[in-house]
Amino acid sequence: MVDNTQIFIMACITILYFILPAYVSNGSALVFGGGLPLDFKKTDKNGNRWIGNGVTWRGLIGGTIMGTLMGAIQGLLGPIILENFGEFIYTPICTNLVEGIIIGFLLGFGAMVGDAVGSFLKRRVGIGQGKPAPI
């Protein structure tokens, strides 16, 4: 019989497993980053940068690729995980390579776009690069 503690633990593991492509994407953007900024160094009418130097094309592309690869790995591992732990998993996970690639791409690219939008919004309210946004 499965108790509530086991359900909670497996739910946490499943959530972390699902969000892993976004985490890998964010970390990889730092590794692959640098180069031309996503905003092409454009400024608004007040002379402020649109996004800043911290969000680059190499980071966007590298992060998205790595998130997609993580999703592909999860797609390959999905059937094995379900076979061995299916009774504990209450959230659907990708069960083949194509699903893994699609989910990995969407989560990885979504994380990169989310970072760029966050940087854009921070610049609009005058928060500098590397400074936390008050939430």
Located regions from the model:
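Interhelical loop and helix-boundary elements at the membrane-water interface
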Residues: V2-I135
